A protein has these predicted regions:
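Catalytic grooves of carbohydrate-active enzymes
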Residues: 223-236, 480-510, 529, 610-613, ...
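Helical hinge/lid and interdomain linker segments adjacent to catalytic or ligand-binding clefts
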Residues: 29-43, 47-50, 289-370
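Catalytic domains of cell-wall/extracellular-matrix polysaccharide-remodeling enzymes
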Residues: 133-155, 161, 172-183, 608-685, ...
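A glycine-rich, often tryptophan-bearing local segment used as a flexible ligand/cofactor-contacting loop or short
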Residues: 340-412
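Metal-dependent polysaccharide deacetylase catalytic core of the NodB/CE4 family, i.e.
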Residues: 76-78, 91-103, 356, 363-373, ...
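C-terminal domain-boundary segment and adjacent tail
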Residues: 256-273, 310-317, 476-493, 523, ...
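A glycine-centered loop/beta-turn motif at secondary-structure junctions
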Residues: 275-278, 306, 400, 409-495
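Non-catalytic C-terminal accessory domains or segments of carbohydrate-active enzymes
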Residues: 263-265, 362, 755, 761-921
Length: 921
């Protein structure tokens, strides 16, 4: 365990019907880019501290164990040059490391001050001590060995006295336990069932005699010292099932298992297994001006995110993630819009990941040269371009999904695959072609059988159609397991509803009867915001509203209208920036210019040079200081213009404690009923993240405000088509201030509001939704035997279950309030940031739906207690409530209606504290 490794953890399916036998789990990760959120579901997470600058602030309340070699040191360690020669006894020939003389008090003091103390400051609350038996290589006599053991024990006790809250894990060190007075949590050892013989470069079974000796040591440690025991075994990276079987055997001895490869550079397996959700999305760019406009982003995000995956995006000509991705990533998707984009280094890297068993999906064009040296690794065989149009000889049901296969077929990549399960098989003359298939390594769909225009040769928004069902293909190609899927569309069984307004047109003058000569903002305030108490996020553009902006003579009036809007209890504040950049990348690249290659870059504020911090944080501070009262603060930035902010703008928002939203174009309608117009929930940009608006505004539905001006009412079509057959999106009423400038446009907005009021929805603020999207990216899902364990930030409160998974058993569950089987899906309601349950269901009472958030939930022997807080009159339903009474403040609540064992309740209040359901059974 001395090497720097890229291990992480977890994917053991264990015995399918068995409950986990261990209450604790361990994980070891010594690689770069430490996934703290995933490690946090483990009781004993161990990391290599040199791979990070410390434990991130958000995780400093949790215990992470830093790897520390107490017996020897590599010359590459930063502190090595400060060691005195007399502190070293000799060398370890296997590793080239130097062995400490721990009988030296000066060395012990040095290690405490120079090694342990900095780690404690970095947030580590535990230490994993390795190389505790290295002294045996140089200490040959019993007296010498006892001297070194006593020195080791003295060092550990010294660390424990210096940091009394620290906890420790030993790698072996059995003989030290009688000598230490430190709080040891666990003892680990390698190779209980299978080991790696480095000299022979092979895996080998552990002899029964060796296993029994180690089990005896483990048993003695548990009985005498009440510590956990951990066994670390080794298997080849591609042998996941073998790893699961070994882990299952280890757990049968009451020993915590960890099974990985000898290099420890992949996610291992334990009885508690995290299901990886990250997927590497590799794009080759496009003809568009920005990578964010490539097909991989426009079309590729939704099928991945809807199935619970979290894309990490890289261009094919950039550096790929280091190490073995097996278990760390759910798979790799390579989406290319033209041929011959990959180079030799990328192909070699892709082959390496394929050999390690990482599922790979190739979309658009082959990710390796079909006649190159790596084609054979993927089973590709080049075929001559057909002389006559090939005929279809076999077709998967998922092909021809939104657009029938053309009668005259052209092949972008004339290939056959010898290892494939064909999804589309063609024949021309003597040759067979398979342009779409799943394979043992993943799968592929090549153009024109992935996405195709309804008008051949024409490109344009709304013309493209999926030729293959993207959900089905991604699921099968990436070999995704059936797992609970974090869902941002729903809470407590109801589809979310929120509204937000971009401030464009705030100073414009309205044409609406009764408001001629008054601003659009005034019309919106009086006719919409005061009439509909729906949670709404309202923004302003500082450069238009402030006295130092473009309209100083109107500023007093505009600021007062904004104050009146923000004073409404159902309105939260957002900034729509300072100068409303129209093209963010160009505006930032040319800060002093007003026009760029795409047109005007921003509003013409005199003397201003574009600065992303001023745009975002500065405008939010203006709102806080001039337009808000009481405890209200600006919550968000709503991106302006092309809604493609730069990473620097996103960083400014995050560092300014502002959420962000806007971008992408979900505009599916009955005239364009295609999933190519259902976009993702957001996009990562380096270390930053842009949250997309779920729906689009009236500008799109009115043909960029050229008419028909009543066109926004068609957003109701979008709402319906993103609800059935799948709930892809919440209901998001998104508009500009100028929608209130024309009678037809205003009436369309009122129509949309009235429709939303008539639906059984769950109102929230846009900021609530943005937090759910961010939580989606880091929520951790683990399986333990046949039970599930979830951990997140507590913002996202819904999991969607595939048909293959049973509903939860509620007795004995943690963090589960109930569930709802609805048309678009089966939704599990979380009541906290952590949840744990086994499959059920059981005929016990449960929360079936609510239009408010759970602020407290506690299951009791004969019912449960709960509190709800929402934004409108409460509506909720309780299942299996026969023979139960719902009490509040000493009285009982009467259901307004009953459907079998489902009882529906209403209250004119927006929140109720300490509701108590008591049942006689």
């Amino acid at each position: 365990m001395r090497t720097f490794v890229t291990i992480l953890f977890v994917l053991l399916w264990g015995s399918a019907g068995a409950q986990s036998r261990l209450d604790q789990a361990a994980a070891f990760y010594y690689g770069p880019d430490i996934p703290w959120h995933m490690l946090s579901v483990y009781d004993f997470p161990v990391v290599e501290p040199d791979q990070a600058s410390g434990v991130p602030d958000r995780y400093r309340s949790e215990r992470f164990y830093a790897y520390v070699s107490l017996g020897e040191v590599l010359a590459s360690r930063p502190f090595f040059k400060s060691l005195k020669p007399e502190w070293l006894l000799g060398k370890n020939p296997d590793w080239g490391s130097h062995i400490f003389d721990l009988s030296s008090p000066d060395l012990r003091d040095f290690l405490v001050e120079q090694v342990v103390a900095p780690l404690w400051k970095q947030g580590y609350q535990g230490f994993f001590f390795d190389t505790l038996d290295s002294y045996q290589l140089v200490a040959k006599t019993p007296e010498q060995r006892q001297h070194q053991r006593e020195g080791l024990a003295a060092l550990i006790n010294q660390i424990a006295q210096r940091y009394p809250e620290a906890r420790f894990i030993f790698n072996r060190g059995f003989e030290l336990m009688p000598l230490v007075e430190a709080p040891v949590d666990a003892i680990a050892a390698e190779s209980l069932y299978q080991r790696w013989e480095a000299g022979k470069q092979r895996y080998a079974a552990v002899p029964e005699e060796d296993r029994q000796w180690l089990l005896g040591q483990f048993s003695a440690m548990r009985e005498q010292y009440q510590v956990a025991t951990i066994a670390i075994d080794y298997t080849p990276p591609g042998q996941r099932q073998q790893a699961r079987e070994i882990a299952d055997k280890i757990a049968g001895h009451d020993v915590i298992p960890w099974v990985t490869n000898p290099e420890l550079d992949m996610f291992g397996l334990g009885e508690r297994e995290v299901l990886p959700r990250k997927v590497l999305l590799v794009h080759g760019g496009s003809d568009e001006r920005l990578w964010e406009l490539s097909d991989s982003i426009r079309y590729g995000l939704m099928p991945l995110q809807f199935q619970g995956l979290v894309p990490e995006i890289r261009a094919i000509n950039t550096t790929m993630p280091a190490g073995n991705l097996q278990g760390r990533y759910a798979g790799i998707v390579v989406w290319l819009e033209q041929e011959e984009l990959s180079d030799a280094d990328f192909e070699a890297w892709l082959v390496e990941q394929k050999e390690a068993g990482v599922p790979i999906a190739m979309l658009g064009y082959p990710a390796v040269d079909p006649v190159g040296p790596n084609a054979q690794a993927f089973g590709f065989e080049s075929r001559p371009t057909p002389l006559s149009p090939p005929a279809i000889t076999g077709q998967h049901p998922a092909m021809g999904f939104e657009l029938a296969l053309p009668k005259l077929i052209e092949l972008s990549s004339p290939l056959h695959n010898v290892s494939a399960q064909p999804w589309l098989e063609l024949r021309s003359g003597e040759h067979t072609y398979t342009p779409a298939a799943t394979t043992p390594w993943g799968g592929y769909v090549f153009q024109p059988f992935m996405i195709r225009s309804v008008l051949p040769g024409e490109k344009g928004e709304g013309l493209d159609r999926w030729v293959v069902n993207p959900l089905t293909f991604i699921r099968e190609a990436l070999q995704l397991p059936a797992m609970p899927i974090p869902d941002v569309t729903t809470e407590n069984g109801r589809r979310l509803l929120f509204a937000h307004m971009d401030a464009d047109g705030f100073p414009s003058l309205a044409e609406v009867k009764g408001y001629q000569g008054q601003t659009d903002a005034r019309v919106l305030l009086e006719e919409v915001l005061k009439r509909f108490e729906l949670p709404t996020t309202i923004s302003v553009i500082e450069g238009e509203v402030a006295p130092h902006g473009l309209y100083p003579k109107m500023s007093a009036e505009l600021e007062q209208i904004a104050r009146d809007m923000f004073a409404l209890p159902h309105v939260e504040a957002a900034t729509h920036t300072y100068s409303h950049p129209f093209f963010w990348y160009d505006a930032q690249r040319m800060p002093g210019q007003l026009y760029g290659p795409e047109g005007q870059l921003r509003l013409p504020i005199p003397g201003y040079r574009m600065d992303p911090v001023r745009e975002v944080v500065g405008s939010a501070e203006y709102i806080n200081e001039n337009l808000l009262s009481g405890d209200k603060r600006t919550e968000m930035v709503l991106w302006s213009g092309d809604t493609i902010p730069t990473p620097e703008a996103l960083a400014a928002a995050r560092q300014g404690n502002l959420l962000n939203m806007n971008g992408s174009d979900t505009i599916i309608t009955e005239s364009a009923p295609t999933w190519t117009l259902v976009k993702g929930i957001g996009v990562p940009k380096g270390d930053e993240y842009q949250v997309y608006a779920p729906n689009q505004n009236e500008n799109i539905y009115t043909r960029e405000w050229t008419g028909p001006f009543y066109g926004f009412e068609r957003v109701i079509e979008t709402f319906k088509l993103t609800e059935t057959p799948h709930r892809f999106k919440p209901v998001n009423i998104y508009y500009h201030t100028y929608i209130a400038s024309k009678t037809a446009a205003l009436e369309s907005l009122l129509t949309v509001y009235r429709w939303a009021q008539s639906q059984p929805l769950h109102p929230v603020f846009a900021s609530d939704y943005a937090r759910k999207v961010l939580d989606f990216n880091t929520i951790v899902i683990a399986r333990e035997g046949n039970s599930w364990r979830i951990k997140g930030e507590g913002q996202l409160r819904t999991l969607r279950l595939p048909d293959a998974l049973a509903l939860p058993s509620l007795p004995g569950s943690k963090g589960i309030a109930g569930y709802r089987e609805d048309g678009p899906g089966r939704y599990v309601h979380l009541s906290a940031n952590e949840a744990h349950w086994q499959p059920g269901p059981d005929p016990v009472p449960y929360l079936q739906q609510a239009n408010a958030r759970l602020t407290m939930f506690a299951r009791e022997e004969k019912g449960f207690r709960f509190s709800l807080a929402g934004h409108t009159d409460l509506e909720f339903a309780i299942g299996n409530a026969g023979g139960c009474t719902l009490n509040h403040n000493g009285g009982s609540l009467t259901p307004v209606r009953r459907e079998g064992t489902l009882y529906h309740y209403r209250s004119a209040k927006h929140g109720l504290e300490e509701l108590r359901l008591h049942c006689s059974h």
